[in-house]
Amino acid sequence: KTSRFLHQRNQYVVNQLGYDHLYHLIRVANVLHSDNPDQVVHDLMDEYKLEYGSFYVENVNSELCSRIPTELDMGKVYARLIVDTLLPNEDYIQGLIRIYNDAICQVIDDYTNGAYYEPSYVKARAYKNGEF
């Protein structure tokens, strides 16, 4: 949600927050989920000095993509990819940072190429192979 609101890629937000802040946010997620989502985004913007960008996830060819996945849809996709590719001795936050800093995100976030719609195991295999 934060990335979409800011018109930034997920990589930007993850890197601006860093490991310690992401760890904290995951720990308090059950509380934050009961807060107003827009207020949470604004609080993150203020606290971490997040800036607006120029990446518009909805800027796709409508002939190739009739429905943009929701933030929740994408969160599920990335959560599965993180868990499916966790490395030995790597925690979830380290995996999250690793995935969001990988080129596969640009492929998955391009809803016109079909990668988003592939089953989880195909995305995990593509990540491990370094390409779709």
Stretches found by the model and what they are:
Residues 1-45:
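N-terminal interaction modules that seed assembly of large macromolecular complexes
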Residues 1, 19-22, 72-83:
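Short, hydrophobic/amphipathic alpha-helical patches that form generic packing surfaces
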Residues 75-97:
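Long protein-protein interaction modules used by eukaryotic assembly/scaffold proteins
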Residues 30-70:
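Long, compositionally biased
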Residues 15, 29, 57-60, 91-95:
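Short coil/turn segments at secondary-structure boundaries
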Residues 20, 24-29, 47-55, 84, ...:
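Amphipathic alpha-helical interaction segments
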Residues 97-132:
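Glycine-rich, aromatic-bearing surface loops/beta-hairpins
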